[in-house]
Amino acid sequence: FHIEIDQNYFKSSNEIYDVKKIKEFDLFLSYICEMTKNLDKEGLKSVADYYDLFFIDLWGVIHNGIEIYKSSIEVLNEITKLNKEYILLTNAPRPNVNVRSFIEKMGMDKEVSSKVYTSGEAALDYLITNFKEKKFFHIGPPRDFGLFKTFEDNKIKDINEAEYLLCTGLFDNQNKELSFYNKLLVAHIKKIMVCTNPDLIVDRGKIREYCAGSVAKVFEELGGKVEYFGKPYPKVYNQATKINNRKVLCIGDNLNTDIRGANFQNYNSLLISNGIHREEIKQNNITNLFDRYDVKVNFLQSQLKW
């Protein structure tokens, strides 16, 4: 294709080049050429002016389940200084208040933790509206019990008596292999499963763990129907703030959820490459990897830095 450029567009009234207009045009070229720009040298600050709202993943971007990354907190502070909004949007299968408490114990300020919104909270709203009186079988660890605290009397121990399945993760004593869930679920594919975390895996420090999404995938492969809550599905974006016509950048380390969610919503995206996909990125051409996942990534950064 051919683009004609009037250089006067980039100049202000005093004939000085307008840096903001140049940056906007640079972003435009990256978009139409489907190029991924690496921000490791320039930092997020090089493109932050262009956006009004930032959806930022928690696990793998802000913390690793054990410690908070200092550079990511600097990013949040700088976004605030620019009078722009950020939302810490996470596929955690628990209510907002539980996850906020969890990261505060790691040292997060309450002012920052108040920006946390979870897939569990989105699922909870749906469950209270549609399934509050129905009996369910819970698949997941005890730490997720807070999700259904207001209707815990409907939780039953016998899966055969359940009207629906609520999946928040894996049982603590069955969290290494998925074959157990194939046997557990095969006779119950006519029931609906509500999955509160579409993520397939997560890294807790240096240990990789299965998430609820892996169990839901087993259920779907058996022929069951799953109602998902969390990225990449749209409901989770709308629970936290009014988007209106604001320019949005989604930041995360997961191509299946963070980046695909941005693509579904027509938002720009930044992939943190030293996260879930770090080994795949090392072993593959980055463009081929994105093609394999069928996603478009606008920016790449090894770790979130300003």
PLM region spans:
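Conserved nucleotide-binding/hydrolysis micro-motifs of P-loop NTPases
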Residues: R94
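Asp-based, Mg2+/Mn2+-dependent phosphohydrolase catalytic module
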Residues: F28, I32-K70, E74-K81, L89, ...
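Non-core capping and flanking segments associated with repeat-based/extracellular domains
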Residues: I22-F25
